[in-house]
């Protein structure tokens, strides 16, 4: 029997990634597919592909930006995502928390890590590019914050995040 899977290539810095992750369980239940989460650096993808964040891309087209925001609000309403809030510190440099996702994957805790960090970013509005905030949050949510953060500095962890990002670009992600 062939197993169906859906790969989500994501960065915590994207509010759309959060929204997608919250809407995916219904699709996965309906299709029987398994979710494969692949952490990457959205900024690295943008740089490699010449793409830009919508707020920059559409800065000179206010009607387009307003429409993008309207569609986001519609999506939030359609999927009942009332806890979502734009992070007041947005955009957030996600390098450390994305490396943390690589560590969590290595330690078999990626799903819990993704749930927790998504909540911190897009529900609680924490400044998730501040090492102290990250360590405190992780420690309060079932992780060894200092140990996980120490591992984000390991060359293998750094290399895996770069590898994931480069592989995403090679596959056409923009």
Across the structure, where does each feature detected by a protein language model lie?
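Structural alpha/beta surface segment adjacent to cysteine/selenocysteine redox centers
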Residues: 19-121
């Amino acid at each position: 029997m062939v197993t169906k899977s859906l790969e989500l290539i994501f960065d915590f810095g994207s509010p759309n990634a959060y929204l997608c992750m919250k809407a995916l369980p219904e699709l996965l239940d309906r299709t029987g597919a398994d979710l494969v989460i692949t952490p990457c650096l959205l900024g690295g993808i943008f740089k490699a592909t010449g793409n830009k964040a919508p707020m920059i891309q559409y800065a000179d087209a206010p009607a387009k930006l307003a429409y993008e925001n309207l569609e986001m609000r519609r999506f939030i309403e359609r999927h009942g995502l009332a806890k979502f809030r734009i992070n007041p510190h947005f955009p957030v440099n996600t390098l450390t928390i994305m490396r943390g996702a690589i560590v969590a994957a290595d330690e078999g805790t990626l799903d819990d890590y993704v749930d927790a960090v998504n909540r911190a970013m897009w529900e609680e509005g924490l400044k998730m590019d501040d090492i102290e905030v990250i360590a405190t949050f992780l420690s309060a949510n079932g992780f060894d914050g200092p140990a996980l953060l120490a591992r984000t500095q390991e060359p293998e962890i750094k290399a895996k995040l770069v590898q994931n990002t480069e592989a995403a670009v090679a596959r056409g992600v923009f």
